[in-house]
């Protein structure tokens, strides 16, 4: 695990974006952890979040032309990432987002910002079922662009309805690379590191390991 990944886990815990416990997911599964990126909800949080996304993007090494943030959650993340790519890495890239409903007046259309062309890096919080990716692909392809990759905060590394995870299905269907700031394996490694000084984490660690054994890929 790299330093920025460990720092991101601690940031997510500090903001209660990441919680350990018992949570029922939309799928009906009982999960030993929950991740809600909507709780990164201040200016400082968003600036820090953008730095982590930018670090992961630079670390991933995938070439792209435009950052795209799908409405709604992807919009502030793509914006913050674009800002921090300049501030932290001196990399200036165009970015854009879509409207849920196209305007029929003014500038019109359903895209705001840079034209959606070339190799697109889609930016979002997590991939759960891959629905947002598939909807975005319709827009990307309609503009004659291609999907270079997907940048997310967390890869849960768990099976969907079949043997593949939603992320693996996206990789298979679109040939796109997925970059995640952290994966479930990083959360387990973090708990293993911290258990020596915080023995009470043993329960959470065991629950995470059991969950991975049952649903992991």
Curated annotation (Swiss-Prot):
Enzyme Commission code: 2.4.2.10
UniProt keyword Glycosyltransferase, yes or no: yes
MF (Gene Ontology): magnesium ion binding; orotate phosphoribosyltransferase activity
Catalysis: reaction(s): orotidine 5'-phosphate + diphosphate = orotate + 5-phospho-alpha-D-ribose 1-diphosphate
HAMAP family: PyrE (MF_01208)
GO biological process, one term: 'de novo' UMP biosynthetic process
SUBUNIT field: Homodimer.
Keyword Cell cycle: no
A single Gene Ontology CC term: cytoplasm
Pfam families linked to this entry: Pribosyltran
UniProt record similarity statement: Belongs to the purine/pyrimidine phosphoribosyltransferase family. PyrE subfamily.
Residues where 5-phospho-alpha-D-ribose 1-diphosphate binds: 26, 72-73, 99-100, 103, 105, 124-132
Keywords of the record: Glycosyltransferase, Magnesium, Pyrimidine biosynthesis, Transferase
Positions that bind orotate: 34-35, 128, 156
Name of this protein: Orotate phosphoribosyltransferase
């Amino acid at each position: 695990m790299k330093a920025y990944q460990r720092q991101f886990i601690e940031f997510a815990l500090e903001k209660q974006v990441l919680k350990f416990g018992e949570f029922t997911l939309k799928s009906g599964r009982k999960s030993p952890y929950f991740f809600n990126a909507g709780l990164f909800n201040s200016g400082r949080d968003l600036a820090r979040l953008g730095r982590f996304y930018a670090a992961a993007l630079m670390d991933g090494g995938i070439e792209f032309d435009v950052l795209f943030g799908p409405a709604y959650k992807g919009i502030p993340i793509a914006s913050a990432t674009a800002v921090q790519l300049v501030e932290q890495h001196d990399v200036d890239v165009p970015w854009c987002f879509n409207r849920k409903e196209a305007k029929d007046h003014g500038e019109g259309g359903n895209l705001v910002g840079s034209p959606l062309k070339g190799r697109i890096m889609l930016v979002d919080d997590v991939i759960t079922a891959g629905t947002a990716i598939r909807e975005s692909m319709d827009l990307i392809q309609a503009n004659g662009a291609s999907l270079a990759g997907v940048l997310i905060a967390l890869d849960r590394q768990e099976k969907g309805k079949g043997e593949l995870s939603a992320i693996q299905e996206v990789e298979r269907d679109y040939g796109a690379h997925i970059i995640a700031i952290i994966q479930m394996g990083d959360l387990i490694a973090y708990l293993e590191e911290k258990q020596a000084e915080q023995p009470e984490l043993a329960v959470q660690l065991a629950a995470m390991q059991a969950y991975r054994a049952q649903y992991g890929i």
